[in-house]
């Protein structure tokens, strides 16, 4: 095990140790535990304002300037008039994400408020519909009551009319019987016989066996089809044709042709 360097030096001064072992060189490995390594030498040489440091961006390998107090950054030196001091992209993304999340929460809250108001409106609409149905039901019940009363009144009036009609018929029959009892002689049927005797000489019933017709006999009926046929040929207004029928003419012609052939 080698002796410490300080002990070797003392022993060498006393002459006890003649050979000094060289101090082993230790390999110094500089480890950077910071994501944004600061270049202190460049910061000192450029004479940056207080709280400003030059830092290398490991993602792109370019330096930028960082204010540790305000947490603002700039690609150019703060002494450069063209420098633009802003927040870092990471900070902007996080702030934008927070703003968007906050906006989404506000939208969700407003949507919930709208849904709540809509539910309130639906509830009020249902209550209005229920009240309207109740009013309609009460109106229908009231109308049924009125209809029932009206029907009873009409029934009573019909009953009264029936009683009045029966009374009138009974009184009419009583007057008729009273007249027959008071008449000294029976009614003559002179008017009826006169009506039967009056007969129009042009009426077919006056000179044929056709039955006597009325004033509407022979007139076209409303529900009778207009076929063009002579409906009076077999009706009550039948008159003898002054000429033979077409069928009789054809039969006579056929008979004449047969007689000629036989001759």
From Swiss-Prot:
Residues bearing PTM Phosphoserine: 94, 245
MF annotations from Gene Ontology: double-stranded DNA binding; ribonucleoprotein complex binding
Annotated spans, Disordered: 94-263
Renumbered residue ranges of the record's region 6 X 2 AA tandem repeats of [DE]-R: 150-161
Residue ranges of the region described as 3 X 2 AA tandem repeats of [DE]-R: 139-144
Gene3D superfamilies in UniProt: 2.20.70.10, Glutaredoxin (3.40.30.10)
Span list, region 5 X 7 AA approximate tandem repeats of D-R-[SG]-H-D-K-S: 104-138
Alphabetically ordered keywords of this record: Immunity, Innate immunity, mRNA processing, mRNA splicing, Nucleus, Phosphoprotein, Repeat, Transcription, Transcription regulation
Subcellular location: Nucleus; Nucleus speckle; Cytoplasmic granule
Any GO CC annotation of this UniProt entry: cytoplasm
Chain positions covered by the region annotation Important for interaction with TXNL4A: 243-253
Record-annotated WW domain positions: 46-80
Residue spans of biased composition, Basic and acidic residues class: 99-173
Keyword set includes Phosphoprotein: yes
Complex and partners: Interacts with POU3F2/Brn-2, ATXN1, TXNL4A, HTT and AR. Interaction with ATXN1 correlates positively with the length of the polyglutamine tract. Interacts with RNA polymerase II large subunit in a phosphorylation-dependent manner. Forms a ternary complex with ATXN1 mutant and phosphorylated RNA polymerase II. Interacts (via C-terminus) with TXNL4A and CD2BP2. Interacts (via WW domain) with ATN1 and SF3B1, and may interact with additional splice factors. Interacts (via WW domain) with WBP11; Leading to reduce interaction between PQBP1 and TXNL4A. Interacts with CAPRIN1. Interacts with DDX1.
Domain remarks in the Swiss-Prot or TrEMBL record: The WW domain may play a role as a transcriptional activator directly or via association with the transcription machinery. The WW domain mediates interaction with WBP11, ATN1, SF3B1 and the C-terminal domain of the RNA polymerase II large subunit.
Protein name: Polyglutamine-binding protein 1
Gene name as annotated: PQBP1
């Amino acid at each position: 095990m080698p002796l410490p360097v300080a002990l070797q030096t003392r022993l060498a001064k006393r002459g006890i140790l003649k050979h000094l072992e060289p101090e082993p060189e230790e390999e110094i490995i500089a480890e950077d535990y910071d994501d944004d390594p600061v270049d202190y030498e460049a910061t000192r040489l450029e004479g940056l304002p207080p709280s400003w440091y030059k830092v290398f961006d490991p993602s792109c390998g370019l330096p930028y300037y960082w204010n540790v107090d305000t947490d603002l950054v700039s690609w150019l030196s703060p002494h450069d008039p063209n420098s633009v001091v802003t927040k870092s992209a990471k900070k902007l993304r996080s702030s934008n994400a927070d703003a968007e999340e906050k906006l989404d929460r506000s939208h969700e809250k407003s949507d919930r408020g709208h849904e709540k108001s809509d539910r309130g409106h639906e509830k009020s609409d249902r209550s209005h519909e229920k009240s309207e149905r109740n009013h309609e039901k009460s109106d229908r019940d009231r109308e049924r009551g009125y209809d029932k009363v009206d029907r009873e009144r009409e029934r009573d009036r019909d009953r009264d009319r029936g009683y009045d009609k029966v009374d009138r018929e009974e009184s009419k029959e009583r007057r008729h019987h009273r007249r027959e009892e008071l008449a000294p002689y029976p009614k003559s049927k002179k008017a009826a016989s006169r009506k039967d005797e009056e007969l129009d000489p042009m009426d077919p019933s006056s000179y044929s066996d056709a039955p006597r017709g009325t004033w509407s006999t022979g007139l076209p009926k409303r529900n009778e089809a207009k076929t063009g046929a002579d409906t009076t040929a077999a009706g009550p207004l039948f008159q003898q044709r002054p000429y033979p029928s077409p069928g009789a003419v054809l039969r006579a012609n056929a008979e004449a042709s047969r007689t000629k052939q036989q001759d």
